[in-house]
Amino acid sequence: LHFTDPRFWIWLYQMEHEIRQNIPIMYYNIWDDLPDPLYNTNFYRSSDMLMSISKQTYGINKRILSKYGYEDWQTKYVPHGITDRRISKIEEKGDTKFKEFEAQYGLDKYKFKILYLNRNIRRKLPGDVALAYKHMMDKLTPEQRKECVFVWHSAPSDENGTDMKAVCKTLLPDYPVIFTYDNGGSMNDEQMNYLYNSCDVYINLASNEGFGLGSCEMLHAGGVIVVNVTGGLQDQCGFKNEKGE
């Protein structure tokens, strides 16, 4: 069983004939966007079974492999799962530990919190999210602005992304932003659950998105998501076809 982008596994595919004589190869895969990546055809054909993380990927696998005699059991839709033991809606937010968490990060000072929880890379469009926050705040009254905050839970700067502290200093000099990494860096499972439950809306404007674990976890915590209709994010939006499926 292997996973992630096929380009990392070319060495495996080069000897797939020898391997598959004794051991089946399974690929847990995802692809962000259309059109179908026909250049991956031979990579897909190097596996005996392909399990797709998103419905879009499942369609891609089926369309590409249909002409090569792959049977239904060889392509399956197997989405990511979220366990209640890790992420769940907190019904009683008066809990002492929850309130201490909010106070630690300054989240208790605001009534409306917008969460960015993605890698700081270009295709996630972090600067666009900050700009959207600015446009929203510009339309509010001064009193309403005091109740809102942009919560950034990711590396503030990344060589593959954006210097978000510089962006926010320039673009949002008068609007509040909380950089959680200023207060301890990454969080454990309990803290992550508190973060989702503390925030009101999760936003992901990525131009291409394989699945979108953050938005799925936010839904699991009973929150609201704002997302682009792309890749696996479509699976979370509740869209149905003409058959209601």
Identify the meaning behind each predicted range.
Residues E18-I19, G161-E190, Y194, K243:
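Nucleotide-activated donor-binding/catalytic signature segment of Leloir-type glycosyltransferases, i.e.
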Residues V224-V227, G238, G244:
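Short hydrophobic beta-strand element within catalytic cores of glycosyltransferases
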Residues L1-M49, K55-Q56:
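Extended catalytic core of nucleotide-activated donor transferases of GT-like folds
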